[in-house]
Amino acid sequence: MHHLRRFIKPDSFLFDIGAGTGRYTSALMAEGYRVKAVELVRRNIDVFLKREPTADVVQGDARNMPFLPTGAADVTLLLGPLYHLIGDEEKLKALNEAKRVTKPGGLIFVAYLMNEYSILSYCFDEDRIEGLMERGAVDGDFHIQAQADELYDYVRIDDINRLDERAGLKRVTIFSPDGASDYMRTRLNRMSDETFARFIEYQKCISERADLIGAGSHVVDVVRA
């Protein structure tokens, strides 16, 4: 929410695409913003509406949203779907739809799962790297090669740059919302409230540093439609 607040205006209308159980939609509604949510999974919608019965949410696929008008949103959030869309072509379908439904010059927030976090925390830390490389799940450049039936796809900054170029999207900024936090979860849980508050302050301060963003578990690419 820290970075969202930097860019959204009080009268902004937002689409939350791939809203899940409505975490972001609920927070934005509580601050007075107008939000329409789209979510693929019916169960998530049910949980969402039980907690937020006045929410405007519709079931749909981020890659094809004919029920949303062209150029309607000041800001579009795409903070989940690209985790699960395997390969450039599927991701581009969602990016192009987000671009279509956003006003020309409006902003799109796009979240990605990062390759290096998974390589370090799963492949090496759990001693799986040799087996994964032997079967081609990780290539010689240590890039995870997700298959079409897998749940997650992982990217590097170069991949995001390529997608932006192909979709005709211009970057405003790119940031890591979590930084090193997923590497040090147990330590964070042991911190005093004062130290944890200082860590949050630190993460906000370094979240846009180009030398750090690719190592976190997620990044959010803020682009202009």
Where are each of the predicted segments found?
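Conserved alpha-helix/loop element of class I SAM-dependent methyltransferases that forms part
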Residues: 1-10
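Conserved class I S-adenosyl-L-methionine
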Residues: 11-18, 109-136
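Class I SAM-dependent methyltransferase SAM/SAH-binding core
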Residues: 22-64
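A short acidic, Gly/Pro-enriched loop at the edge of an enzyme's catalytic core
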Residues: 67-76
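A short glycine-rich, Lys/Arg-flanked "PGG" loop and its adjoining helix->strand segment in the class I
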Residues: 92-104
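Short alpha-helix
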Residues: 151-167, 174
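A C-terminal cap/extension of S-adenosyl-L-methionine-dependent methyltransferases
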Residues: 173-225
